[in-house]
Amino acid sequence: MASSMLSSATMVASPAQATMVAPFNGLKSSAAFPATRKANNDITSITSNGGRVNCMQVWPPIGKKKFETLSYLPDLTDSELAKEVDYLIRNKWIPCVEFELEHGFVYREHGNSPGYYDGRYWTMWKLPLFGCTDSAQVLKEVEECKKEYPNAFIRIIGFDNTRQVQCISFIAYKPPSFTG
């Protein structure tokens, strides 16, 4: 009874289709390639320039906290901050000022894996500056935040509201009590 329930389509074998691609025949003969090579023992012509590179010292990781973009540079002056803010405004990003009272850097207090409580999410100072066209407006907000929270880390971020991503972030102010 069960055999009569099967459709006839399952019983018919279909013929194998011809392939449009030629089968792989292995590697080509080495006769097409030049057999002799010039022995090159000159170390200065190696592409990595390994013989001429001097060792460079890396950024010392002990006692130096890494923050955001440009954190390896000395603190930015007001004119340098204004240039950075002008850059993010030219790119049509929305400036936003954020602050952090305790840790101005990524830290892992509640585990080893990244998550919400690892120092990447700061408190927003007021609202993002939608429609901002002048870096002086943003720097004025940074100064107000400094007056309100003199012991806070303050950063400026550039938010792209079209792609809904943060495009740039840099420290605008470190508290005087910070030694790192």
From Swiss-Prot:
Residues 1-54 form a transit peptide. One of its GO terms (biological process) is response to cold. The modification Phosphoserine is found at residue 113. Keywords: Calvin cycle, Carbon dioxide fixation, Chloroplast, Membrane, Phosphoprotein, Photorespiration, Photosynthesis, Plastid, Transit peptide. SMART domains: RuBisCO_small. The keyword Lyase does not apply. SUPFAM superfamilies: RuBisCO, small subunit (SSF55239). The keyword NADP does not apply. It is found in: Plastid, Chloroplast membrane; Plastid, Chloroplast stroma. It is a peripheral membrane protein. One of its GO terms (cellular component) is cytosolic ribosome. One of its GO terms (molecular function) is copper ion binding. Heterohexadecamer of 8 large and 8 small subunits. RuBisCO catalyzes two reactions: the carboxylation of D-ribulose 1,5-bisphosphate, the primary event in carbon dioxide fixation, as well as the oxidative fragmentation of the pentose substrate. Both reactions occur simultaneously and in competition at the same active site. Although the small subunit is not catalytic it is essential for maximal activity. Belongs to the RuBisCO small chain family. There are four genes coding for RBS in Arabidopsis thaliana. This is Ribulose bisphosphate carboxylase small subunit 1A, chloroplastic. It comes from Arabidopsis thaliana.
